[in-house]
């Protein structure tokens, strides 16, 4: 199996003579050893093998890792199949009749065989005879015992899809790591339509992986479909063979067994179903890939199909906003919607993609806000400086300027009055001045009215009369006093008293007259003031 032919025993068996490998050489090895069955690490069974070689169908009895096999085969050009032990299994094939292979084009050869196979290192794999080129039927009966890793009994179909019926009765013992016996009753397809079906297994020491396959149509060489269903037995580490479940997958149930048996009869129908199923299965990964690509494109901001895109607006001048046009990577419909939804004619839409674009937009806004805050801080500092300067310097200067303005106004008024007087000297009066002068003349005439003068004269006359009366009274008093003095000489004191009283009376009269004189002078002053006012009004007009 690994590059040499001959009968070799592994793990303690002594091999008989071995020869080198050749394409046409017959190798005959005869070993006689105690027979061993079942689970063995080198046990061998007596084999007597005769291998005849043909052109392309030479049969060789080859034992690997200590197993001996005996096969008696003969065959045609393409129809022989060597019986090979797998990895240390020893097998003995006893044929009731001569076991012959098929012919060139698959003539039917009845090969009733009964084989008893002992377990090898990795389990026995007794191989039945295969069909011919265009399909032969073969019947095999085998009984196998479990190997180290379990036994496996199987059969293959013919080249173009012949029917092979296998009535297999297996008595299998579990291997060290879990035997994998298979009870198979199936009609297998041909070269382009074969489909392995159905096994029932028992658990091993470390947990055997069990598979029960029930399939409907036979698969081809390039598109076999296998649907493993798990039925695990208890072990130390069971391995479960499962099928990935998708939205389009359909679970295989046990109810499909009858449909399977019915469909196995019609080979062309199986082939068409297999082709359709292959096409469907080949479309599934493509659909998954398309969905994954769609999901990736919808989240990738570098593609135009991404869903993470939106429009933001920048403020510009209205004249500049008219000049902006649609960028090449933006869709026309989205651009039209963004232009319709813009808040004012002074804004333009800008498209951003993904979270990175949004982050950049946020960073730009934060930078602009920071710059605006810096500018506002500068403005605030300048305003505080101006306010301090105004309070300390400008306000005091304003007060000084106001006081200077008051002084200047006074000086201007003085100059104005002086200029007015200078202008009025030797100059003709104006219309306003003539009016004022006429008003003053009227007032002056009123003051010089004879009625007014008569009143003043009357007052003066009354004053004169009063003065005369006062003189008369005083003279009368003096005369009376003289009379009293004559009458009462002796009364000096009395005379003195009367003199004092007369003096007091005179003084009172003088005071009264002086008061009246004061009143007259006051009236004269009032008249003079009124005359001056009238003159001023006349000068102004």
UniProtKB/Swiss-Prot annotation:
What InterPro entries does the database record attribute to this sequence? Nucleoporin_FG_rpt, Nup54/Nup57/Nup44, Nup54_alpha-helical_dom
Disordered: region residues: 1-261
Cite the record's Low complexity compositional bias ranges.
1-13, 83-102
Q: Does the keyword Cell membrane apply?
A: no
Protein's cellular compartments: Nucleus, Nuclear pore complex; Nucleus membrane
| FXFG repeat ranges per the UniProt record | 21-24, 39-42
Q: Does the keyword Signal apply?
A: no
Q: Biological process (GO) annotations? A: mRNA transport; NLS-bearing protein import into nucleus; nuclear pore organization; nucleocytoplasmic transport; protein import into nucleus; protein localization to nuclear inner membrane
Where is it mostly found?
nucleus
A Pfam match is Nup54
Provide the GO MF annotations for this entry: identical protein binding; structural constituent of nuclear pore
Report keywords, A-Z. Answer: Coiled coil, Membrane, mRNA transport, Nuclear pore complex, Nucleus, Protein transport, Repeat, Translocation, Transport
- What remark does the entry add? Present with 9310 molecules/cell in log phase SD medium.
Q: What is known of its domains?
A: Contains FG repeats. FG repeats are interaction sites for karyopherins (importins, exportins) and form probably an affinity gradient, guiding the transport proteins unidirectionally with their cargo through the NPC. FG repeat regions are highly flexible and lack ordered secondary structure. The overall conservation of FG repeats regarding exact sequence, spacing, and repeat unit length is limited.
Summary of subunit composition and partner proteins: Component of the nuclear pore complex (NPC). NPC constitutes the exclusive means of nucleocytoplasmic transport. NPCs allow the passive diffusion of ions and small molecules and the active, nuclear transport receptor-mediated bidirectional transport of macromolecules such as proteins, RNAs, ribonucleoparticles (RNPs), and ribosomal subunits across the nuclear envelope. Due to its 8-fold rotational symmetry, all subunits are present with 8 copies or multiples thereof. NUP57 is part of the NUP57 subcomplex (NIC96, NSP1, NUP49, NUP57) interacting with NUP49 and NSP1.
Q: What is this protein called?
A: Nucleoporin NUP57
Q: Which gene underlies this protein?
A: NUP57
């Amino acid at each position: 199996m690994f590059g040499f032919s001959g009968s070799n025993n592994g793990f303690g068996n002594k091999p008989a003579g071995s020869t080198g490998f050749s394409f046409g050489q017959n190798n005959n090895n005869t070993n006689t050893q105690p027979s061993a069955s079942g689970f063995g690490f080198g046990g061998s069974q007596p084999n007597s093998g005769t291998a005849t070689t043909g052109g392309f169908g030479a049969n060789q009895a080859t034992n690997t890792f200590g197993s001996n096999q005996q096969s008696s085969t003969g065959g045609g050009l393409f129809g022989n199949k060597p019986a090979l032990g797998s990895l240390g299994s020893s097998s003995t094939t006893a044929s009731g009749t001569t076991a012959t292979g098929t012919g060139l084009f698959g003539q039917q050869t009845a090969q009733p065989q009964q084989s008893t196979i002992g377990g090898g290192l990795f389990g026995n794999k007794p191989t039945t005879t295969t069909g011919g080129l265009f399909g032969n039927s073969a019947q095999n009966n085998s009984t196998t015992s479990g190997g180290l890793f379990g036994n496996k009994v199987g059969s293959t179909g013919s080249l173009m899809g012949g029917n092979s019926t296998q009535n297999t009765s297996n008595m299998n013992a579990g291997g060290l790591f879990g035997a994998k016996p298979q009870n198979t009753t199936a009609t297998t397809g041909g070269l382009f339509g074969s489909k392995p079906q159905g096994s029932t297994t028992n658990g091993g020491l470390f947990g055997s992986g069990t598979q029960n396959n029930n399939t409907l149509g036979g698969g081809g060489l390039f598109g076999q479909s296998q649907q493993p269903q798990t039925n695990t037995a208890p072990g130390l580490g069971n391995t479960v063979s499962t099928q990935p479940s998708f939205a389009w997958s359909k679970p295989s149930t046990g109810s499909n067994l009858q449909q399977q048996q019915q469909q196995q009869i019609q080979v062309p129908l199986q082939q068409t179903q297999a082709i359709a199923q292959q096409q469907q299965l080949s479309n599934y990964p493509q659909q998954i890939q398309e969905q994954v690509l769609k999901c990736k494109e919808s989240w990738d901001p570098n593609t135009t199909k991404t869903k993470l895109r939106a429009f933001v607006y920048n403020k510009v001048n209205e004249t500049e906003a008219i000049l902006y046009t649609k960028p090449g990577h933006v869709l026309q419909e989205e651009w039209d919607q963004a232009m319709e939804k813009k808040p004012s004619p002074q804004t333009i839409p800008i498209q951003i993609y993904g979270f990175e674009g949004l982050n950049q937009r946020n960073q730009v806004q934060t930078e602009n806000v920071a710059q605006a805050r810096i500018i506002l801080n500068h403005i605030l500092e300048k305003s505080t400086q101006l306010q301090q300067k105004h309070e300390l310097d400008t306000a005091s200067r304003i007060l000084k300027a106001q006081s200077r303005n008051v002084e200047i106004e006074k000086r201007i008024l003085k100059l104005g009055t002086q200029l007015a007087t200078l202008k009025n000297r030797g100059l003709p009066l104006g219309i306003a001045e003539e009016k004022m002068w006429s008003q003053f003349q009227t007032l002056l005439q009123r003051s010089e009215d004879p009625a007014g003068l008569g009143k003043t004269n009357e007052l003066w006359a009354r004053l004169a009369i009063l003065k005369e009366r006062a003189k008369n009274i005083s003279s009368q008093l003096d005369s009376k006093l003289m009379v009293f003095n004559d009458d009462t000489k002796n009364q000096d004191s009395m005379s003195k008293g009367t003199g004092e009283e007369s003096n007091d009376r005179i003084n009172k009269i003088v005071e009264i007259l002086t008061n009246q004189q004061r009143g007259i002078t006051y009236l004269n002053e009032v008249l003079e003031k009124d005359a001056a006012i009238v003159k001023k009004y006349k000068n102004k007009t």
